[in-house]
A protein has these predicted regions:
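Catalytic phosphate/metal-binding cores of nucleic-acid and nucleotide-processing enzymes, i.e., regions
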Residues: 1-93
């Protein structure tokens, strides 16, 4: 693991709180090397997502991970707001 722990994006607490308010189960995994930020369970589905602020770019590791899963037909979302996250899990339209 890197000498420097990965920090959570500043909007992460707000997004996680909104997800939990609609009944989602959220686990933080952003401190694990080469992982995305959260795993979210909601209404029988599991989402593995990266949380980013505004136009903050993905890191090289994040981009590589998302592309690797895309090659096998799995889309890993990048959520930049509470609305994106709630829409992403199907809690709102």
């Amino acid at each position: 693991m890197s000498r420097f722990a990965r920090k959570a994006d500043r909007n992460q607490p707000e997004i996680v709180q909104a997800l939990r308010q609609v009944g989602a189960e959220v686990r933080h995994i952003h401190r694990l090397p080469k992982m995305l930020d959260v795993i979210v369970g909601y209404r029988g589905q599991l989402f593995w997502a990266e949380l980013k602020c505004d136009n903050e770019p993905l890191t090289e590791d994040e981009r590589e991970l998302i592309e690797a899963y895309k090659r096998v037909g799995v889309d890993l979302p990048v959520w930049r707001s509470t609305d994106e996250a709630l829409k992403g899990i199907g809690a709102i339209n």
